[in-house]
Amino acid sequence: MTLRTTALATDSWPAFTTHSADDVIVAALSISRLVDWCGTPCVHTADAATPGSGGRLSETELASVLAARVVSARWSGDLRLHVVIDAELDGCRPVVEEARHVGRASTAAAAAVVLESGRTRAAGYAAFLPGDIAAGDLVVIPCLVVIPCLGVTLLHDVKP
């Protein structure tokens, strides 16, 4: 989905998450800048939003945002765009219907995609992303649990 035309589902993202035409910002931290610092895949963990609150801060729960780089994107005979990313989605309860393309604004129509991991042979996840997504692009996916992954750069907001 292009960032310009779709609103974030606030219950799926950490509290205080906003977006621009080419970025997702979690608690004032640009995910695009985070990737510049940490590389991909990387995870930002912050306070979760309280379900049904419209994005208000949870006092007890955490949520993660996974940033991954597109390794390849190809149209398949099943009429879907198969997008391979450099991250593993299994185990993090990804909200793939909220996946966002960041790093550059896209005006391409949303296309049905299958997000696949370049690390395992696990089955893909159905999502919608811009039809012009290509190798090198960034995808950001909210996850409903904290991601305790090995080999992934983690950044966590710490409460004062």
Segments and roles (model prediction):
Residues 30, 55-160:
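Charged (often Lys/Glu-rich) extended helix/loop segments that serve as interaction or gating elements
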